[in-house]
Amino acid sequence: MATSDQDRRHRVTRNRPPIARPSTSSSRPVVSPPRSKVSKRVLLRVASVACGIQFGWALQLSLLTPYVQELGIPHAWASVIWLCGPLSGLFVQPLVGHSSDRCTSKYGRRRPFIVAGAVAISISVMVIGHAADIGWAFGDREGKIKPRAIVAFVLGFWILDVANNMTQGPCRALLADLTENDNRRTRVANGYFSLFMAVGNVLGYATGSYNGWYKIFTFTKTVACNVECANLKSAFYIDVVFIAITTILSVSAAHEVPLASLASEAHGQTSGTDEAFLSEIFGTFRYFPGNVWIILLVTALTWIGWFPFILFDTDWMGREIYGGEPNIGTSYSAGVSMGALGLMLNSVFLGITSVLMEKLCRKWGAGFVWGISNILMAICFLGMIITSFVASHLGYIGHEQPPASIVFAAVLIFTILGIPLAITYSVPYALISIRIESLGLGQGLSLGVLNLAIVIPQVIVSVGSGPWDQLFGGGNSPALAVGAATGFIGGIVAILALPRTRIQKPIPLP
């Protein structure tokens, strides 16, 4: 970071009154023992778990909103199923971050949480994949609504959201620990994380777009589980293997130094943990410097923009481009598969952008890059609205397949959105890790603070997007319009309010 930025942060720290903290020893920031700089290869292996996490997340994003509608939940309420994601992020992510900052396990602070999260992910996707079979075993039969299968699905879905938050946060915190507040190394590590997210997305969306898994895993098709269900189940079997491989690669690469359980700090530690946690995460807000609040504001606006797309991307393709409905004909499932293909191409662009991230931020400044990416996101959402409008007036819906030009436009928009998505997955985490270090927070808790700016908007979108869309006659365009507006505003704020610092070319990493 440039000298002027360092001086600014030091002045804020010097003029700020001391942060009031509980008297318990657990509230004191955890300081890791000094270590030598880790190599890029180690950072790469540690970040690899993001590939396994994102593989399952890609399946979740591309297939589960359509699938839950096939189980009988109306489109207007499908977004409510996703409510657990932001709710678990609101509570689980900060709690896990706080706990991992103070974990005294002999295996390290972060790795136990990564492994536990990976196990929970594996269990949850098995429950989701077998939801129809579980529902059948407990009395579901043929019908439009399968209530017992829905209960099993929602249970597995919510466990999956909790597990994703339990795994991803400690992994990012571990990368921050290993880079030891080196600005460039932090950006590089987050770039690696985004790169592996892109690889996981490509593989996950490719898996979700293939309709022949039930022919390979023939046992997955049952009396309760049709072809679409069997393909989903098969994809999750692959996910379990993939998450196991990447978790082993990640945790075996990081050599964490366990925290010493000092007898002098033992007194009162267990009794004051919750109080200290709440005090740290909320009590420090008023001491944040202005640029931290700008980062949190832009993050919130960005995610109000992204979440409607994340919820309904393949559903938008199936309904508004292919003109289908769940459980009626083949148009909807064909649209979902094409949407998954578009998301796979999206992930290719995400990966390319992740590789170029460091150079872009060094040349133009992280705030400027973030702002431009948000404006690009808003333009793409506007393009989706225009494409839906044109498709609805061509007269093919309900009679024939969409014209190639409409499909091409939709897939192109999905693809281009990979560029701003890569920025969203990387730049805010790097900025927040660097800028609030002076507050004395551990990396796990600092990322939990940023997570609040992500999940609160997601709660709002999850609750409001379905009724909001119905207010304007259904479809996904109203929520996308809100996303375009907030994304554009966030981009302007980032460009104008975040320092456009150009970083000098650094010495190559070892």
UniProtKB/Swiss-Prot annotation:
Task: Please describe the relationship between pH and activity.
Answer: Optimum pH is 4-5.
What molecular functions are annotated in GO for this chain? sucrose transmembrane transporter activity; symporter activity
What biological function has been recorded for the protein in this entry?
Responsible for the transport of sucrose into the cell, with the concomitant uptake of protons (symport system). Can also transport maltose at a lesser rate. May also transport biotin.
Q: What is this protein called?
A: Sucrose transport protein SUC4
Which stretches of this protein does UniProt put in the Cytoplasmic compartment? 1-45, 93-111, 170-187, 255-291, 357-365, 424-443, 499-510
Query: Which signals induce this protein?
Result: Specifically induced by H.schachtii (cyst nematodes) in nematode-induced syncytia.
Pathway membership: Glycan biosynthesis; sucrose metabolism
Q: Which residues carry this modification: Phosphoserine?
A: S23
Source organism of this protein record: Arabidopsis thaliana
Q: Which domain of life is it from?
A: Eukaryota
Q: Which gene encodes it?
A: SUC4
Family annotation (PANTHER family): SUCROSE TRANSPORT PROTEIN SUC4 (PTHR19432:SF90), SUGAR TRANSPORTER (PTHR19432)
Matching entries from InterPro entries are given as: MFS_trans_sf, Suc_symporter_pln
Q: Point to the regions of Low complexity compositional bias.
A: 21-34
Per the record, what ranges lie on the membrane's Extracellular side?
Answer: 67-71, 133-148, 209-233, 313-335, 387-402, 465-477
